[in-house]
C-alpha cells in the first residue's frame, strides 16, 4: 500500500521531471523535505533500500531540475539510491510495490521507464555506460548531455578508472557526479572550497580559462607548463581533485549534497560546459532520519518497520547460510593460523563481522574489486597461506578471468565461499546466482560442491579448505532446513561422493544443493529414489551408473541454469559411459528471472515442491512397462 500523496501537497504537483522544472527554484528545499518524508514512510511500509535514497534526495532533485531528462541521460551507479528518482519519474503511486513480485524493480531498469537510461545492479558501470552515450551523441551530432552518478564505494573498482581514463583521452562531453557519503568537510575548508567551486564552474571563469589556454599555447612550453602547475597548486590547497585532473577531468567540489540551491547553481553552470568534468558532492547516508544516519549499514536494506520505533529486533530461528559460513570461518581460523579471509566489500552480507573483529590481521576487505580479490587470494596461496574468498555468485562473474588464469591454471588452493547461489529474491536478475555451476564446471582443476543443508555446508567448507586446489562451495541466501551444525567436526568429506537419501522405484532424482529437501518430500509421495549428489565436479560417477542401471528414468534437479549446469554434466557422463537411460533436467530456464520472494520465483520456474511433483508425476505417468 502506497503512502497517500494528499499529505504531500508540493510533491503532488510534481508527477514527472517536466513538472518539476516548472517550479520556482526557491521551492526546491521544501520539495526535498516532502520527498524525503514520502520516501521514508513508503519504504517503511514496503521494505527496500532506504539509507542511500535518503542521502540522494537533493542531488536527484537538482539533476532532474537542471537537465532535460530523459533527453539528457542520467546513469545511476548500482541503483540503491534510485528511489527518489523513481518517485519523480512517474512511478510514485507504485512505490509500494518495489521489489515485490510483479512490482517495480529495486534498481533502474530500461524496460520500466524511459528515465531509466541504463539497467544497473552491479557497481561501477555508470561511467562506462554514460561515456558510451556521450560518444554516441557526439557521433550523431546531437547536443544531449550524459551524466554518471557514482558513489565513493563504486569509485574503488577498476572499471570506473578505466572509463575515466578513456573519457579524458577522448575529450568526451561527460559529467561525472561523485556522490561521496564517507567524506566530511571541515567548516572553514568546506566553505572556501564550495565558494571556489561556484567560481570555477561559472561561465565567466570558464570563458576566461578557455581564452587563457589559447594564449598560453602561443607561449614557449616552459611558460605554459609553469602556468598549468601554478593553477593546479592553487586549486590543490583547497580542492582534493588532483587525481581526476590527471585523468583529464576538470574537478569541481566538494559541494554540500544537501544544499539543493548550491547544487542547482553548480550543475547549471556545468551543464553549459563541455569536456570531461567531475563534480564532487558530499552527502550523508540516511539523511533526515536519525537512526539511518547513525547506522546506515542497518538501514541499507530494510523490511517493513515503524519509523517511530526503528527497526524491529531480529527474532530467532534457523541460521542463515552466511551465518553458518561465519561460524565455520571462526572455528577454522582458531584451529589454523594460516587461514586468511577476503571479501570484496561484503563483510556484513557474507557473515564475516565476527571474524573481522576477532582476526583483524587475517582479514582483508579489498573494496569493490572482485578481480583483485581473486588474484590476491592466488598470491597468498603461492606463499602457503590458506585463503578463503567469500563472494556472491553474481559478483564472482566479475573475477572470472582471474579465477581461470590466476587460480585454476596454476591449481592453487583457494577456497571460494560462493554465497547467494540460486534465486536470491527481491534484488532480482542482477543479483540471482543463476550461472555459477555453468561457468565453474568447465574450468579444469576446479572442484565444486553444493550442500543440501547447513550441516553439509559446514562439512563441505572444511573439505574445500583442506583440498590442495581450487574449490568452490555454493550456498543460497537465507536459512536452510535447520540441520544442526557439526561444530566440533572440521574434517573433510570424500570428494566426488554423493549419498542416496531415499530408495524408491522407477525414477531416480539426482538433486544438487538446496533442492534435495523438496525432492525428498516429493519422493515420499511418489515413491522415488533421491540422491544428494553433493559434488558437481567431480560427479559421483559410480552412483550415477548404479542408479542408471536400476531405474527407468534419471532426473537432475538444480537451482542453476540448465544450460551447462550440473545436469549437463550428468548427461555428458552418461554419453561418455555409453549408458542408455533417459534423463531429464530441471533447473532455471533460459531467461533472466525477475524479482519476487524466493518462494514466488521457485514456483514460477517450477522448482518448488508443487512444481517438482507436477514434473515428476507427469514423467512417471508416461513411463512404459514395469520398473527394472
UniProtKB/Swiss-Prot annotation:
One of its GO terms (biological process) is terpenoid biosynthetic process. Keywords: Isoprene biosynthesis, Magnesium, Metal-binding, Thiamine biosynthesis, Thiamine pyrophosphate, Transferase. Thiamine diphosphate binds at residues 80, 121-123, 153-154, 181, 289, 370. It is an enzyme of class 2 (transferase). It catalyses: D-glyceraldehyde 3-phosphate + pyruvate + H(+) = 1-deoxy-D-xylulose 5-phosphate + CO2. Binds 1 Mg(2+) ion per subunit. Its cofactor is Mg(2+); thiamine diphosphate. GO terms for molecular function: 1-deoxy-D-xylulose-5-phosphate synthase activity; magnesium ion binding; thiamine pyrophosphate binding. Mg(2+) binds at residues 152, 181. Pfam families: DXP_synthase_N, Transket_pyr, Transketolase_C. Its EC number is 2.2.1.7. Belongs to the transketolase family. DXPS subfamily. Catalyzes the acyloin condensation reaction between C atoms 2 and 3 of pyruvate and glyceraldehyde 3-phosphate to yield 1-deoxy-D-xylulose-5-phosphate (DXP). Homodimer. This is 1-deoxy-D-xylulose-5-phosphate synthase. It comes from Alkalilimnicola ehrlichii (strain ATCC BAA-1101 / DSM 17681 / MLHE-1).
